A protein has these predicted regions:
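Alpha-helix-centered segments that form part of catalytic cores
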Residues: 1-9
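Residue-level detector of conserved, well-ordered beta-strand and adjacent loop positions
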Residues: 2, 17, 164
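Short, solvent-exposed coil/turn elements at secondary-structure transition points
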Residues: 3-4, 19, 80, 158
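Metallo-beta-lactamase
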Residues: 10-100
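C-terminal regulatory/interaction regions
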Residues: 105-166
Length: 166
């Protein structure tokens, strides 16, 4: 199906790329939007500090689409349902933007794992194994975006690929 298609005779499909490569949600005929992990509740953002996503630009575009979506209720997978998704989308956008700046600033001839380690140390807590894997994936997505934007360079070093802010 494509975004906007009616699925099963009643659900309108939503394109929610960003958290995952091909994530979708649905809007019911009575205006309830099931938005999955495309937007997280503020308590989840505060608790974890690193939302999982695989495509930074698409995650931001999805937040834009959610803000423009007409629905009476938005139901995220993690967080309470809300009638107005805009404050939640803005909170998610702030966290993503801040994380991008932080990762860019940590690109000082560090490996990806060095960047993840520096972020973990700065937060003052150690991630469990699952959180560590999710954190690495999000940092990898940001490094890809920063490389595409020409804001960092990558080079080979004895410890592996290292990233340097331009």
């Amino acid at each position: 199906f494509d975004p906007g298609d009616v699925v099963g005779g009643c659900l309108r499909a939503l394109d929610l790329k960003g958290h995952m490569v091909a994530m979708a949600g649905a809007v019911t005929p009575d205006g309830v939007a099931f938005v999955g992990d495309s937007v997280l509740g503020e308590e989840i953002l505060a608790k974890h500090g690193v939302p999982f996503f695989v495509d930074y630009p698409q995650a931001l575009k999805t937040l834009d689409r959610l803000e423009a979506l007409e629905a009476r209720l938005f139901v995220p997978s993690h967080g309470e349902p809300v009638g107005d998704v805009r404050p939640l989308a803005e909170a998610n956008r702030r966290v993503l933007s801040s994380l991008r700046e932080e990762v860019r600033d940590l690109c000082r001839l560090r490996t990806r794992d060095g960047i993840v380690g520096a972020r973990t140390a700065a937060r003052g807590r150690k991630d469990d194994l699952v959180a560590e894997v999710l954190h690495r994936a999000s940092v990898s997505a940001l490094l890809s975006d920063l490389l595409d934007a020409g804001e960092v360079q990558v080079q080979e070093a004895p410890e592996g690929l290292v990233y340097q802010r331009v």
